[in-house]
Design a protein with these regions (language model features):
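Surface-exposed patches in mature extracellular/periplasmic domains of secreted proteins
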Residues: 68-72, 117-126
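Short, solvent-exposed beta-alpha or beta-beta edge segments that form flexible loop/patches at the rim
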Residues: 58-79
Length: 221
């Protein structure tokens, strides 16, 4: 997309061509404009598309110190179409240390431009945590939302696919859940993977903005 924001409304220090704050540019989950039969299959999504979104997430995580927190598991789900063949993927919730919102916007925008994805931002504060967000998506309904929680001190990352078919020759006798999902460690081998929260729901100290910048990038948990 080639929407251009008015420089006077930008929070960035300099006007970035193509940067838009139009929340209407979001691609909602399962709301892709491409007909189901023409969308990528799960196999193509996992091998090609998901890694490109993961690259943008990694860029943000590196800026935040190279530590990526996880909360929950990645899973397959049924789509809102209620067609038994349609599936989507909700990846594990991810969190990184807080970075400057303008830096977050710029990194995500650059990743969107590099990959041909759509970009959107909501720069106005909302809620008690001073929430702001940045999102990147595509016409297949795939979506990654970075929620900048200034009041909580971290960035939450929601990573979802759009609706799709396991294969273009889907066989109901071959359950889609037999298609393995890569682990967070496999998707982000260059980042240090940690539990985002402890058993008391306290944020991992490695994800605090103070420690994140000093952690460096390491593989493994």
């Amino acid at each position: 997309m080639a929407a251009t924001a008015a420089c006077a409304s930008l929070l960035l220090a300099a006007c970035v061509p193509g940067l838009s704050d139009d929340a209407g540019l979001y691609f909602g989950r399962n709301d892709g404009s491409v007909p189901m039969a023409e969308r990528q299959t799960v196999e193509v999504y996992i091998s090609d598309t998901a890694p490109r979104y993961a690259g943008i997430i990694e860029d943000v995580a590196r800026e935040a110190g190279g530590v990526l927190g996880t909360d929950g598991d990645s899973r397959y789900g049924g789509c809102t179409t209620q067609d038994e063949a349609d599936v989507d993927i909700a990846w594990a919730a991810l969190d990184v240390a807080l970075i400057d919102y303008d830096d977050l916007r710029r990194i995500v925008w650059e990743g969107a431009q590099r990959n041909g994805f759509a970009y959107s931002a909501t720069p106005d504060y909302s809620g008690k945590n001073n929430r702001r967000s940045v999102a990147v998506g595509d016409e297949d309904g795939n979506l990654v939302v970075f929620t900048h929680l200034e009041g909580s001190g971290f960035i939450n990352i929601s990573f979802h696919s759009g609706c799709m078919l396991p294969t273009h020759t889907y066989d109901l006798d071959t359950p889609y859940k037999q298609l393995p999902l890569p682990s967070v460690e496999e998707m982000f081998p260059n980042l240090r993977i940690v539990d985002a929260f402890d058993e008391n729901s306290n944020l991992n100290p490695e994800l605090s903005s103070q420690s994140g910048a000093q952690s460096g990038t390491q593989s493994g948990s």
